[in-house]
Amino acid sequence: MFLANSLALAALARRALLAAPAGQASRFSSSVFTLGVASGDPSPDGAVLWTRLALDPTAGGAMPPTPIDVQWEVARDERFASIARQGRTAALPEWAHSVHVELDGLEPDRWYWYRFRVNDEHSPVGRTRTLPRAGAPVNQLRFAFASCQQYEMGYFTAYRHMSAEDLSVVFHLGDYIYEGAATAGRVRQHLGPELMTLDDYRNRHAQYRTDPDLQAAHAACPFIVTWDDHEVDNNYAAMSHERGDPIELFERRRAAGYKAYYEHMPLRTRSLPRGASLQLYRRFAYGSLASFFVLDTRQFRTDQPCGDGVRTPCRGAFDEKATLLGLEQERWLSDGFTTSKSRWNVLPQQVMIAPIDRAEGPDERLSMDQWSGYQSARTRLLQLLARRRLGNPVVLTGDVHSNYVNDLKIDFRDPKSPVVATELVGTSITSGGDGIDEPGNLSALLAENPFVKFHNEQRGYVVCEIGPKAMQADYRVLDYVSRPDSPIRTRASFIVEDGRPGAQALKR
């Protein structure tokens, strides 16, 4: 069915391109490239190029209900003196006039520049980078990861700084949009009600995409994206959700959220949504240096066994049938670990693996939406990391609007349990507002959770640099997001050495 849907979409685009009337874009009196450009899902010979045509982005786009002819160019230089590839495609009204160009035939491990054109208007120029050849020696990879960008809670200043970081790729770990209606008194305002329909989700994505700092980050390098919950509904789990609506209503809502997500992300046709389903977990290899296993902990999970919120785990948290990944994704991950020959193996995913205990003393209060609510599934994952003797496993996590560095163990209660991996938890871009450096209960939190090496509650992102001998993580933080001019600084740096699980703080 997926292949048939992909082929049908490609055939529809080809027919629309042939039928598109000449000179159609002369009707447009203002820019159609209001949402910028992006690239993503790189391969050794290509990437996905993205844009969406919209005259009035937050009012459904205001484009005519017809296909639009879009030309694209890929160059070896930023002046477009040496064209590597070029072509035409159709932006279809059925897909909100979004454009997804899947490139091939490019050289591995190099930068390219790209742009789109509708009639006489050129889009902004974007830059993308191909992956190295499979198994090729790679000495360095510099990337960032980010998550949780609630538009109302602050300015996307972090992305302005990120666009100047000289990164090969950015991993976005979810909560790219938030689904709630406008809340009075916040820094910026959502437009429209709580998201329910396809038009709602399209307009919210478009509102976020109009932000110039977010556009700059997307234009600077490719993004590899995955989602968390707010792309559809807070803390949803497969077809379970907090409103309690009939499953048929939520299925339609999830399908709307998934389609709008695809329309606004640089994803390949293999991720083309099929109703309320979308294939998002996938693997990327940077030569022999690093493999990235991008996970989806929302679409296939069972409902939270102990309910939502922070509480003492119930018996259901230890149910072996409870899962965040689903059996098929667990098998895919196990097979990937078995075949990986990379020196570093990185898991970009959504929710915290380490069990952060919020209660002092013998009582235990854990987040039931995180891996702590699915403890048998967490044990399976950590045992898999240990049993496969995977080269240097590192987990990248978002969701919690705070920075952490955690040692991961199969048994967190046993001080003698060996460290099997490192978890780098990145804070939010804006969610939670300005934040603070250290919470008042930091000493108690560290005492209750000795596997935590670092904790901070400012906004920002994490920049990582991987080499054959070590991986370094720099925690980049902003002083505030309630105003758009915050400087950025490195709050802390940690290093994971080759063959030595666990992170060590670097002196600053």
Predicted regions mapped to residue ranges:
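Metal-dependent phosphoester/phosphodiester hydrolase catalytic core
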Residues: F2-R14, P21-R508
